[in-house]
């Protein structure tokens, strides 16, 4: 079994082992904005409780993040290594918990100063939002992302150098499109390599 396949065989529910595999691949260039990490903490509290939020923050040594500061992506993974075992139990399984977390994080982002800027930029049009997904993600974290259209309202969104499982991004993408009143939104993600994934996105 390849190293990547072994990594995928470990569930996010398993905490340190799963996230530790990803932490071992982090470089100094892998960063996240404070606004993203603060939204993750809020989602941990919303999906779990205040005690879990505090334990997760303690795991990375940061009680609060400043919106436009850059932080090592490792802090994000450290938080999740603590939070995910409990969240997976509360929300059926790890994929459900991660989907809900991604949804919460996206909704919180859209209410931020950066998110409001994105909403002005895309003028309420789902297709404009999708075209600007690489830019939107860069406001929150590093990594390479691209969009390839396969039809008028369907595309393939590709991520490279991304440390989160597909279910997290599925929740984020659904939330952002539904917020723009897109109907029958469908997002199906697949892991294509250890730090790479792709998403088939469609709506009506």
Where in the sequence are the language-model features?
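Extreme N-terminal basic, low-complexity initiation segments
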Residues: 2-6
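N-terminal low-complexity or simple alpha-helical regulatory segments
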Residues: 8-110
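Short terminal or interdomain "cap/linker" segment that borders an active site or interface and mediates
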Residues: 25-26, 30-34, 137-170, 177-204
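Amphipathic interaction/junction segments at domain boundaries or subunit interfaces
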Residues: 65-168, 189
């Amino acid at each position: 079994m390849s190293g990547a396949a072994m990594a995928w065989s470990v569930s996010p529910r398993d905490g340190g082992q799963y996230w530790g595999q990803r932490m071992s691949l982090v470089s100094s260039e892998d960063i996240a904005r404070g606004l993203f990490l603060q939204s993750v903490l809020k989602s941990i509290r919303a999906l779990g409780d205040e005690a879990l939020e505090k334990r997760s923050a303690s795991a990375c040594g940061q009680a609060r993040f400043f919106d436009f500061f850059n932080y090592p992506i490792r802090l994000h993974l450290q938080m999740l290594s603590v939070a995910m075992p409990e969240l997976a139990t509360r929300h059926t399984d790890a994929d459900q918990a991660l989907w809900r977390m991604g949804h919460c994080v996206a909704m919180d982002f859209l209410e931020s100063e950066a998110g409001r800027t994105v909403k002005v930029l895309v003028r309420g049009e789902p297709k404009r939002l999708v075209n600007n997904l690489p830019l939107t993600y860069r406001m929150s974290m590093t990594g390479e992302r691209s969009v390839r259209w396969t039809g008028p309202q369907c595309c393939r969104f590709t991520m490279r150098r991304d440390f989160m499982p597909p279910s997290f991004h599925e929740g984020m993408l659904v939330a952002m499109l539904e917020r723009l009143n897109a109907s029958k939104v469908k997002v199906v993600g697949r892991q294509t390599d250890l730090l790479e994934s792709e998403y088939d996105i469609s709506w009506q």
